Design a protein with these regions (language model features):
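Intrinsic-disorder/coil detector with helix-boundary
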Residues: 2-379
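N-terminal flanking helix/linker immediately upstream of nucleotide/cofactor-binding cores
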Residues: 6-13, 385-440
Length: 440
């Protein structure tokens, strides 16, 4: 693999909220922690100096990442409603955000697009469908209802997503994500409390049951779980939060997968770096109020609406700002609960943060012209009027203004320069000396 460079340049220190271009939103603390490990530096280590708009209840973390000034938001609660409210408030305080990245964890359709999707892989949104299943459990589940597909991404988002639908763009992003994942793991390893938090849980712990094999109590004749069938009979409430090892879920019903065999070989060769590298997929998210808990529901909705992953916040952020959802796979949305679920959640949060960070290396920075607020804050920082006047003169002019000025002169600039030369004292003196010298 060719060496891949990463961007760590420092952004100019912002003078106001208008200087922030990128927002990152996370629903859980573990997702926020993973993102913050990739922030190159923080602007609010000594307190928040940028404030927020009236009525905005968000708490912001500000810093820079890959040359961009960024603002990170941790939702007060997971879910669509909290995401929608937080994003609307974000937009009112940070009015110049050009891109919002919603990062975190998701449930995946393991055989979407005819491919094998594994735990720790990352899904990037190209579209989002909002769904509401009612109850997602076998007992009393309602028929699924889906709203219209949410608004089409704007050109800003579509242009960057199209790059990652190409083999070249996707491979480059994958290589960068691998580097940033190692960076997260290295930084976390320096802290005893979370030394192994983002460690790859291993291919043997990536377990997928057949879609028809429900998570319930087995070998319990007195339990209502014993009467369950695929038509929708009840399972007991206690089974929903119980580990597969305790319910008696039989590993004879596991699905074999070729990619896991490849990862196992890499691990046997002590090449964990290659084994943990996530694959990246671009496709449609399903966004609902709660997570899926039944594989047959997952597969039915996915097949009908071409969905490859499910999550719970995207519908709340999608239409508020230019948004890309980037989420790591932590479960298969089938209700099965593994003993190392927490490890997969942390690892998936890290892979998602790594892909989000890699994406920013390809996102073009927008030319910025100083806002009135920025100029006023600069004026306040310098008391000397001469300094203020000098700083104002140094502000870069706007190309549209320059174009208008040049068009209005209609070639006059050349004439003005010619006249200036002829009237210049140094030129006149030189000309007089030349004429005098010519007479001798």
């Amino acid at each position: 693999m060719a060496a891949v460079s990463t961007t760590t340049r420092k952004a100019l220190r912002p003078t106001s909220r208008d200087d922030f271009e990128i927002a990152i939103v996370c629903a859980k603390a573990l997702e926020y922690d993973a993102v913050c490990l990739l922030v190159d530096g923080f602007w609010n280590e000594d307190g928040d100096s940028f404030g927020r708009a009236e009525g905005d209840l968000n708490t912001y973390t500000t810093g820079y990442m890959g040359g961009f000034n960024i603002v990170v938001v941790l939702l007060c609660d997971p879910g669509e409603a909290a995401a929608a409210g937080a994003t609307a408030s974000l937009r009112s305080s940070y009015t110049r955000i050009t891109l919002l990245l919603l990062t975190g964890t998701c449930d995946v359709v393991p055989d979407a697009m005819g491919k094998e999707l594994l735990l720790g892989d990352v899904v990037i949104s190209d579209t989002v469908v909002q769904y509401d299943l009612g109850s997602h459990y076998p007992n009393g589940r309602e028929s699924d209802t889906l709203g219209d597909r949410l608004g089409r991404p704007d050109k800003n988002v579509r242009s960057i997503i199209m790059i990652f639908k190409t083999e070249l763009g996707l491979q480059r992003l994958k290589e960068k994500a691998s580097i940033y994942l190692e960076k997260i793991q290295h930084k976390a390893s320096k802290e005893q409390r979370r030394k192994a938090t983002y460690k790859y849980p291993g291919s043997t712990n990536d377990i997928l049951f057949k879609s028809t094999y429900c998570h319930k109590h087995y070998r319990s004749p007195q339990c209502i779980c014993d009467d369950y069938n695929e038509a929708g009979d009840r399972v007991c409430d206690n089974s929903r939060g119980t580990l597969c090892e305790q319910t008696g879920c039989d590993k004879d019903y596991l699905v074999p997968r070729l990619r896991l065999e490849d990862k196992k070989k890499l691990e046997d060769d002590d090449n964990v770096k290659a084994a943990q590298q996530p694959s990246i997929f671009v496709g449609r998210f399903g966004s609902g109020y709660t997570s899926l808990r039944l594989a047959i529901d997952r597969d039915r909705i996915a097949q009908k609406h071409n969905i490859i992953a499910f999550e719970t916040e995207g519908a709340g952020t999608w239409d508020e700002l230019s948004c890309i959802i980037i989420k790591g796979v932590s479960t298969y949305g089938d209700g099965h609960i593994l003993s190392d679920l927490k490890s997969w959640e942390n690892f998936a949060a890290a892979t998602a943060a790594s892909v989000a960070r890699g994406l920013l290396d390809y996102y073009p920075q927008t030319d910025r012209w100083p806002s009135v607020e920025s100029k006023n804050q600069t004026d306040t920082a310098f008391g000397n009027q001469a300094d203020i006047a000098c700083l104002r003169d140094l502000y870069i002019t706007s190309p549209p203004d320059d174009r208008i000025r040049i068009e209005q002169t209609k070639g006059g600039l050349l004439m003005d320069a010619y006249v200036w030369i002829l009237q210049n004292d140094a030129y006149k003196q030189c000309l007089a000396w030349t004429i005098t010298y010519a007479y001798f």
